[in-house]
Amino acid sequence: MARCSVLYFILLSALINKGQACFCDHYPWTQWTSCSKTCNSGTQSRHRQIVVDKYYQENFCEQICSKQETRECNWQRCPINCLLGDFGPWSDCDPCVEKQSKVRSVLRPSQFGGQPCTEPLVAFQPCIPSKLCKIEEADCKNKFRCDSGRCIARKLECNGENDCGDNSDERDCGRTKAVCTRKYDPIPSVQLMGSGFHFLAGEPRGEVLDNSFTGGICKTVKSSRTSNPYRVPANLENVGFEVQTAEDDLKTDFYKDLTSLGHNENQQGSFSSQGGSSFSVPIFYSSKRSENINHNSAFKQAIQASHKKDSSFIRIHKVMKVLNFTTKAKDLHLSDIFLKALNHLPLEYNSALYSRIFDDFGTHYFTSGSLGGVYDLLYQFSSEELKNSGLTEEEAKHCVRIETKKRVLFAKKTKVEHRCTTNKLSEKHEGSFIEGAEKSISLIRGGRSEYAAALAWEKGSSGLEEKTFSEWLESVKENPAVIDFELAPIVDLVRNIPCAVTKRNNLRKAFQEYAAKFDPCQCAPCPNNGRPTLSGTECLCVCQSGTYGENCERRSPDYKSNAVDGHWGCWSSWSTCDATYKRSRTRECNNPAPQRGGKHCEGEKRQEEDCTFSIMENNGQPCINDDEEMKEIDLPEIEADSGCPQPIPPENGFIRNEKKLYSVGEDVEILCLTGFETVGYQYFRCLPDGTWRQGDVECQRTECIKPVVQEVLTITPFQRLYRIGESIELTCPKGFVVAGPSRYTCQGNSWTPPISNSLTCEKDTLIKLKGHCQPGQKQSGSECICMYPEEDCSHYSEDLCVFDTDSNDYFTSPACKFLAEKCLNNQQLHFLHIGSCQDGRQLEWGLERARFSSNSTKKESCGYDTCYDWEKCSASTSKCVCLLPPQCFKGGNQLYCVKMGSSTSEKTLNICEVGAIRCANRKMEILHPGKCLA
């Protein structure tokens, strides 16, 4: 039949070649049907309006013309609208700020063109407090107190300089003594060095350091551009002026897509210790180290440009420095506005009020850096045109660099190489490689805005004037930006203010919650392995190379991959503080999970940190100052004429009626923490000589703490504490097995056997080998054959206690090896129990049962075991369960004469009844096989 079909099509082809071919457009198409979906890729079809006429039949139209066509439509993703939760209740009225707040969260960011959220997330209102404010004024001791509450050195009074910031140190001065012999100007733009920096948004924020404060020291620095020195502020360790304009420091970088440009795993260290989140922000490199830019502007613009077509990017950048600076490591002078904001923070933790610090002043401050400017452009090229140009990535970078030196820097002796003007891309644009770009995104920083704007490249523009770059460079000296900087957390600045320790702890807690709002774990997965990034309350998709479209849903012809890389879901809430003073949180690689060979998520699944819990009544946050950050037991001991100081409780114990001094004859009671119990006499008595009469007492653990295991493992039963003797079972997802023991028992104060932290799941190769075969067998084609212990049992399998009737000995064997040897007709091996062999009743009965089994007429396979006449196989547990004697069959050939308990009378029982009685551990003596003679 197939041969006839081939001959038919050969004949048809010959006829068509002679001119007898159907002109299919003679039969028009219908209109396309409406799309089957409004979004998320639907289909639509159309049909050819066929009329079976003479022309149709004579010209083979039936065989030549397609009758139906289908095409994809509405391939854009369905929009996801931003969704806000309801406001929670009003917080308690804070007595220090006389405000209360209520907050709501973003339940779902907008994505794929959905409606954004524009309503506020926090609401405040004034209130009348019912409690007193516990914040006390800072103790200035021997320093001068400003009207603002700030403490400054006494030597700064009446020196003619506004050191307090409110001029209160210069009030009522009879005579002033100047610090410097003449007046010096401040360093230009010195206030920029004291700005806060929002690491998560990549932009400077409000002033946190007062760099107008000189600290009563006349330290100056001189610039080569001016004859007059500048006054150095007290917050700066050193300052050095320089101007760098070398032509050879013009650098270029090539990016196949924006994922590598906006994501750098190695650049998250500045805040990873505060939350360990997986998110990152767009990072751009300068000459010294990586820096962030505002991902709500330039990076967002780059993402939107990449959606138009499959794109590659070439970035060219040059750093010009005016000066370098280093901030002092300690004793920094805060700005008045930042100090006022810190002083107005409540003592009780309030997420909304504490988070405003990061909104207003950023998350970090500059510890070192440079002032200057950065010439920085990101050129977008069509990936297809770059590929067709015939240039390599390195050659394309070189052409952009050479052309920039000639057209922007107007560098003399710059020779444009032949390959940069004669490739297929440059030839379309009169020899210009840069003109072949789709557009450019300006990342220029520093200098006057009109000069910076003039440096930006636009497609089809006539080019720059020769003075444009030099004018911008000159303006950088007067209008610099902070570049090439190092950062430290802004929380470190919260010192020497009232309740500094309490407020630092609250700010650290607020930062964890605040940083989570920037985590793209809240976004839905992007098509074609795109990487989601969160911009405010909107999720954007950063496309992989070879993909494009508003949400990366379109593919270039050569993009064939179907792999889906895994991305982290959001962190769970922190667990409660357990008896080991630890708490933990977890996350899953399921947004999405890796599929079809995609990469697994990088980073940790579980985080653990120290924590504390109180056994006393919670009376609110205490006001702890920097000089009070010590425990009560560190305070000086109270001297008294009589009585006893507080005794030392045993480890994991505490004193019920705790105080510093006890009267003679007074008793104290020792209690133990949860999970421990007192062993011994738990009362101490104060003696007249100031010592304690006490017996031996200790706190012994009565429970085991839930073990820490890999997230892929499931603990059953799942609870925080387990009593002595309780067991847990570790299981894995379907298709995987525990790579070690799966059952553990709480014994004493630890788990037996010990649970390894590295214990995880592995692919269940035994199931794959086994196929549809019985235990101990493997699939070989369509047949089942016995496994070979040496070849097929190299992986982990649980331990079994096994009895060998040949050697009359028992030993521990891996389950796989035991089943394989049983399959190979090794009948002398008998299963005793799961787990390693241990002396006891279970082992005694197992040995007796194995010896007695040779006389059984029934041998039913059941899991690892074989059930005999006195047993049945449990379908739910795959274990042999002993029958009760009345459940045994009557009669039979296997009979025994026995004597029960202390009775002297003899009785004839069959093998089932004898086995059932011995299994129940009842006393019985077997006199001889066969019926009793009497």
UniProtKB/Swiss-Prot annotation:
Q: Region labeled CCP 1 — which residues?
A: 611-688
Q: Return the GO cellular component terms, semicolon-separated.
A: extracellular region; membrane attack complex
Q: Name one GO biological process term.
A: killing of cells of another organism
By its UniProt entry, which SUPFAM superfamilies does this protein fall under? Complement control module/SCR domain, LDL receptor-like module, TSP-1 type 1 repeat
Which residue numbers delimit the Sushi domain? 642-701, 702-763
Q: Where are the transmembrane segments?
A: 278-290, 402-415
Q: What is its main location?
A: secreted
MACPF domain sequence ranges: 176-522
Modifications the protein undergoes after translation, according to the UniProt entry? All cysteine residues are assumed to be cross-linked to one another. Individual modules containing an even number of conserved cysteine residues are supposed to have disulfide linkages only within the same module.
Looking at the record, the residues that make up the TSP type-1 domain are 22-79, 81-134, 565-612
Spans annotated as Factor I module (FIM) 1: 766-840
Per UniProt, what is the membrane topology? Multi-pass membrane protein
Q: Where is this region: Factor I module (FIM) 2?
A: 858-934
Where is the stretch described as C5b-binding domain?
642-934
Q: Name where it's found.
A: Secreted; Target cell membrane
Quote the record's activity regulation.
Membrane attack complex (MAC) assembly is inhibited by CD59, thereby protecting self-cells from damage during complement activation. MAC assembly is also inhibited by clusterin (CLU) chaperones that inhibit polymerization of C9.
Glycosylated residues are 29, 32, 38, 90, 324, 392, 568, 571, 574, 855
Summarize subunit and interaction data from the UniProt record for this chain.
Answer: Component of the membrane attack complex (MAC), composed of complement C5b, C6, C7, C8A, C8B, C8G and multiple copies of the pore-forming subunit C9.
Family statement? Belongs to the complement C6/C7/C8/C9 family.
Q: What does this protein do?
A: Component of the membrane attack complex (MAC), a multiprotein complex activated by the complement cascade, which inserts into a target cell membrane and forms a pore, leading to target cell membrane rupture and cell lysis. The MAC is initiated by proteolytic cleavage of C5 into complement C5b in response to the classical, alternative, lectin and GZMK complement pathways. The complement pathways consist in a cascade of proteins that leads to phagocytosis and breakdown of pathogens and signaling that strengthens the adaptive immune system.
Protein name listed in UniProt: Complement component C6
Gene designation per UniProt: C6
